[in-house]
Amino acid sequence: MRLAIGLLMVGQLAAAEATVIRGRTVPLTQLPSGPSQSRLAVVFLPGDGGWRGTAITIARNIASWGFDVFGFDTKKYLEVFSADGERLTTKELASDMRAVAEQVAGMPNRPVVLVGWSQGASMAVAAAAGLHARTPIHGVIALGLPQSGVLGWDWKATLAVVAHREPDQPAFAVRPLLSASSPVPLWFIHGSEDEYTALDTARSLFRSAGEPKHMEEIQGANHRFEGHQSELFQALQRGLSWITTH
């Protein structure tokens, strides 16, 4: 079996898990919706900052709406596959994300929605591209989708982000993947003041996507949606509801 999950309970609010992908361990955190398993599961893919801060806040809010949420540490994933000069391919990244979705879906399979933010959004789109059937991935919600996603991460990349520079890492283009995403429903959420991907660029990416799709713009919001989390959460709720009807 190419992917397995081991569970270690760390408290009532969340469970820390380890997901083994092609022999390498990547942190996963489950935030259950309640005493019973929810009908739909969400895999939350944060940005290159990993599983911390705002990413956890967003995931906890989604769980509070009655969804089982699994927070995948995108930064750690990229780091463990960048060891010794290695780099992922786009095909490997997409396959890995699909494997995580399949494991989270469980048996019998339940629908899974990938909610990605920034780098995580590019990874969610990659996972959806080229699927001939939606199961188990029934939809993607992309927050602050960039034009490209990276295929590796190291300490120099972290310093580049702090300095507001592009990390010197191999990357993949998002636009061609968007056109290959149909029939998986795509819900875009973008801040009008996003400092990494301009709104006009985000609109252009949206036009490249296959149907069904929908885009919501949050006026005044930056890439982190600071000061606009209420609007963000409302848009997320609408997106999850919309995906369940498609």
Regions found by a protein language model. Give the residues of each.
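Short beta-strand element of the alpha/beta-hydrolase
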Residues: 39-47
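Conserved alpha/beta-hydrolase
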Residues: 62-81
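Alpha/beta-hydrolase active-site loop
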Residues: 85-106
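Primarily recognizes the serine-hydrolase "nucleophile elbow" in alpha/beta-hydrolase
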Residues: 103-162, 169
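Short beta-strand/loop motif that positions the catalytic acidic residue
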Residues: 181-182, 188-190
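Conserved alpha/beta-hydrolase "acid-adjacent" motif
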Residues: 195-201
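Catalytic histidine-centered segment of alpha/beta-hydrolase-like enzymes
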Residues: 221-231
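Catalytic active-site module of serine/aspartate enzymes centered on a nucleophile-bearing elbow/loop
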Residues: 229-246
